[in-house]
């Protein structure tokens, strides 16, 4: 290809915002000549390369904006350490069909069993698929909502939690809330109901959410909306953080209490589809 034509292609690519093509046109032409590509194959190569770079850039930006503390994947999760957890069900969630139907995912279990890892892995997969994601702990979210309310910016702050396609709320139950704080959580869940997906992690069974939220009526109302279209994963295994300290590893109860039992909303909740 002549230098004049190469220069003109680079100028066109720059004006079209195709920065990768501008930088690699000579290399791509050489590859096409080596592989004896036809015209259509060469055009497909050019567009595929540019699209791949743009998608990679979009994915990195989405991860940066998500607030995820760790970029986990399901491939990193040790399912053999949690034998009661069905890998097939988790991988079914990773298809992200629950996001398409504005459903939720709740992960229940004691500290250290991998709830946040799984929530983060689903969130990373959602970012990669083009969904907007935001991660927060319940305590941090409530703190920001209270500060916003005190400064007359409550609706604006609440909207920031309504905007993402997927909102991950970590550590529900680690710190109790008062009734005013629980009401803020109710407003959030109510506004997102059937409009956007939530991924929740909690170390408390649903029966204990009344204590966590400081009000049984509010807890029931929140769970009613949260569980209407929800996949619940209960993890009852040992802690990953203690697995290398055998002397400290507690013995797992062979008959653990079902964390999904006990609340009226949990009893009446019906899954959208049978478990995988």
Each predicted region: which residue ranges?
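Solvent-exposed alpha-helical segments within well-ordered globular domains of core cellular machineries
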Residues: 7, 11-14, 23-26, 44-45, ...
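Interdomain "pre-motor" coupling segment immediately N-terminal to P-loop NTPase/helicase cores
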Residues: 10, 14, 19-70
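Conserved, well-folded catalytic cores of nucleic-acid-processing
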Residues: 12-19, 28-31, 49, 53, ...
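AAA+ P-loop ATPase motor domain of ring mechanoenzymes
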Residues: 44-97, 101, 243-252
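Conserved P-loop
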Residues: 85-163, 212, 275
